[in-house]
């Protein structure tokens, strides 16, 4: 609950400061970053799983997956994208970050409404009703979200998850070797069997360089 509320508060605070209007600035697929597409894919995958779980009365299963999803949304997507929200320039990249987070939150509160009726209603009123007066009066009067298959890019999910795993292993290696993150290192070595995943990691190495505080990465066999 705290994580969900913190994500909502983060969006509400900065969107209000910047005067972002989600109705006038819908998602533009051409301006989305890799992580935007990834969290959208994860969101629609969650919608699909939520629908299946609730149909079979397995709320417990859904909540476990929801906790994992919230952790990724908060501790990966938002943490990695803070600079996009904080920067002074009101450019397309910043608008895409806001539009993505609004899309995610709008779907998340509708997904979770049957399980967390009061929290989802409060967020809905502040987030959706304040933005669109033509929207339903309550989250509980909204249609349940439908997963859009074309948004569930499984290859992208696989690639970003591999990138995250590489960073996690890098942090673990630093901890074992007693090298703090604040101490820059010249190179990080990584090994992966899949050439496509390796290519993705190299193409997005800036994330690894920043997360692990290294100057370069190199694949080893």
Feature locations, PLM:
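Feature 926 captures the class I aminoacyl-tRNA synthetase adenylation module centered on the KMSKS loop
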Residues: 1-221
């Amino acid at each position: 609950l705290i994580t969900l509320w913190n994500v909502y508060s983060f969006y509400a605070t900065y969107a209000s400061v910047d005067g972002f209007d989600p109705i006038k600035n819908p998602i533009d697929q051409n301006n989305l970053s890799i992580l935007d597409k990834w969290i959208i894919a994860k969101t629609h995958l969650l919608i699909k799983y939520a629908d299946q779980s609730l149909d079979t009365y397995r709320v417990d299963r859904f909540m476990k997956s929801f906790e994992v999803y919230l952790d990724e949304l908060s501790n990966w997507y938002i943490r990695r994208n803070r600079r996009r929200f904080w920067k002074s320039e009101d450019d397309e990249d910043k608008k895409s970050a806001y539009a993505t987070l609004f899309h995610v939150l709008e779907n998340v509160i509708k997904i979770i409404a049957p399980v967390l009726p009061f929290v989802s209603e409060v967020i809905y009123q502040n987030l959706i009703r304040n933005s669109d007066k033509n929207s339903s009066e309550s989250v509980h009067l909204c249609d349940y979200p439908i997963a859009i298959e074309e948004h569930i890019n499984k290859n992208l999910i696989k690639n970003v998850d591999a990138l995250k795993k590489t960073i996690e292993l890098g942090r673990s290696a630093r901890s074992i070797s007693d090298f703090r993150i604040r101490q820059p290192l010249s190179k990080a070595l990584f090994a992966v069997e899949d050439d496509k995943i390796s290519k993705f990691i190299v193409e997005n190495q800036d994330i690894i360089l920043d997360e692990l505080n290294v100057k370069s990465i190199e694949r080893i066999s």
